[in-house]
């Protein structure tokens, strides 16, 4: 099957295991989910034929993941809030505390991620406001069947998703790709492991909203 002309977002929805492959190849399927596979692969100098073959194998594998394409929008929202919103509220404060400790204890080391705690704090503050607006304004509109009239708030949320994506790139730069240095202490390793988990969750979160919930809501489903 030819996948090259489909968008990354469409492929991530149709082939749930594709998200892991896209993350490994640094293909942005959440904020950049509207670009075609061919275009995204071209930007990264990836072999499109090999990439299509990999997706073909993934598509043939059985998956236990729920297919959200036909699920009621209220069910998607009911999944997003505890799985992602509440999880981010738990993750970030702990990551900030660990980042502060690592910066304090290892401030004199060359690989110390100076500024990481401040960057994570900024992400936490911005994401908290963002999620609150979704929960108080946008999600109730969608739940009441008013999604077709929600173009303005959806546009704002998508722009804030883009901002979150850029903030995550700063985190990656500060942490050398979120890879702990050789000999890093347990806290340092736990911090980077937690950041990687947060980034994975955030990408899945944005993907589900940008590529599935919002388009379906705008269509008046």
Curated annotation (Swiss-Prot):
GO molecular function term, any single one: metal ion binding
Main location: cytoplasm
Entry keywords, A to Z: Cytoplasm, Iron, Metal-binding, Stress response
InterPro entries cross-referenced by the UniProt entry: FeS-repair_YftE, Hemerythrin-like, RIC_family
Family: Belongs to the RIC family. YtfE subfamily.
Function: Di-iron-containing protein involved in the repair of iron-sulfur clusters damaged by oxidative and nitrosative stress conditions.
Origin species: Pectobacterium carotovorum subsp. carotovorum (strain PC1)
Record gene name: ytfE
One cellular component term from this protein's GO annotations in UniProt: cytoplasm
Pfam families in UniProt: Hemerythrin (PF01814), ScdA_N (PF04405)
Protein's GO biological process: protein repair; response to nitrosative stress; response to oxidative stress
Subunit structure: Homodimer.
PANTHER family: IRON-SULFUR CLUSTER REPAIR PROTEIN YTFE (PTHR36438:SF1)
Record's subcellular location: Cytoplasm
Protein name: Iron-sulfur cluster repair protein YtfE
